[in-house]
């Protein structure tokens, strides 16, 4: 089995993703921020859309679903929780479910916090994680519907995946994430290296994803809230990791 992944920009800073099964020619869009760029990418590759795998109900992730469904009659897969907020759903999934895209297998991880219905899709064979707005490169999503312990627990689920997995996230926020992270984790050598890489990529107008999950574990301060050095930097020595994470997220909200 082999998969091809295409990345492109949707809306202002959303990422659009297509994952294509070479064997069966099945193609899934991970979320559908808007139809236009997805249609162009499909046309450019000569692919037919068979599935849309939705991560959560926010409009900037489902805005193109209706038009794509009408054109391709593709299957729409969405979280079971609050599924009524998402139109045209064919299959509702929960934690541990496996979704087939041709011969490719996507494992569902419930990762609530950003929204209560948020899920991530893990393609274990392809060592690929689509984390949408739960985990960003050098950052994480805002916590709109859940709470900080819930979001921290979701990040721990993603952190538990192997280091060689590729992270594909929902938005191109990496440069601003790096800027914030350096204010709270300035001596982190891995973060410094990632900052230099991101500066170069953005100067060349290239996306900063995918990133390797192992690199994120070393450089992303939001994945390191349980490390004593991070708590000490925030003057929270001995504090619960979820509380440290919450303080990091509050500071990022204000940055």
Predicted ranges, named:
Residues 2-47, 120-132:
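Conserved beta-strand hairpin/beta-sheet module of binuclear metal-dependent hydrolase folds
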Residues 7, 18, 98-124, 128-129, ...:
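Core dinuclear metal-dependent hydrolase active-site scaffold
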Residues 19, 31, 56, 68, ...:
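Divalent metal-coordination and catalytic microenvironments
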Residues 27, 34-110, 127, 193-197:
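Active-site HxH/HxHxD metal-binding segment of metal-dependent hydrolases
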Residues 32-33, 57, 81-82, 114-115, ...:
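Active-site metal-binding loops of divalent metal-dependent hydrolases
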Residues 84-87, 138-144, 177:
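A short acidic, helix-capping loop that chelates divalent metal ions and anchors anionic groups
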Residues 139-165:
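Active-site-adjacent loop/tail segments of enzyme domains
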Residues 156-166, 175-255:
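Accessory terminal helices/loops
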């Amino acid at each position: 089995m082999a998969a091809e992944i295409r990345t492109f920009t949707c809306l202002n800073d959303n990422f659009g993703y297509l994952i294509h099964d070479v064997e069966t020619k099945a193609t899934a869009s991970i979320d559908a921020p808007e139809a236009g760029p997805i249609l162009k990418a499909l046309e450019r590759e000569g692919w037919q859309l068979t599935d849309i795998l939705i991560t959560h109900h926010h409009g900037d992730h489902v805005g193109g679903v209706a038009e794509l469904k009408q054109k391709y009659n593709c299957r729409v897969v969405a979280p079971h929780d609050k599924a009524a907020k998402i139109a045209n759903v064919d299959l509702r999934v929960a934690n541990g479910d496996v979704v087939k895209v041709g011969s490719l297998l996507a494992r569902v991880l419930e990762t609530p916090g950003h929204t209560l219905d948020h899920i991530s899709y893990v393609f274990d064979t392809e060592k690929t994680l689509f984390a949408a707005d739960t985990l960003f490169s050098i950052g994480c999503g805002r916590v709109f519907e859940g709470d900080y312990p819930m979001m921290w627990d979701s990040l721990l689920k993603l952190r538990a995946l192997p280091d060689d997995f590729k992270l594909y996230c929902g938005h191109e926020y990496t440069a601003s994430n790096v800027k914030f992270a350096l204010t709270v984790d300035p001596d982190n050598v891995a973060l410094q290296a990632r900052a230099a890489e991101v500066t170069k990529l953005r100067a060349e107008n290239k996306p900063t994803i995918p990133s390797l999950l192992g690199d994120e574990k070393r450089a992303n301060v939001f994945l390191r809230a349980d490390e004593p050095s991070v708590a000490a930097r925030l003057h929270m020595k001995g504090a619960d990791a979820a509380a440290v994470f919450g303080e990091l997220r509050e500071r990022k909200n204000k940055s």
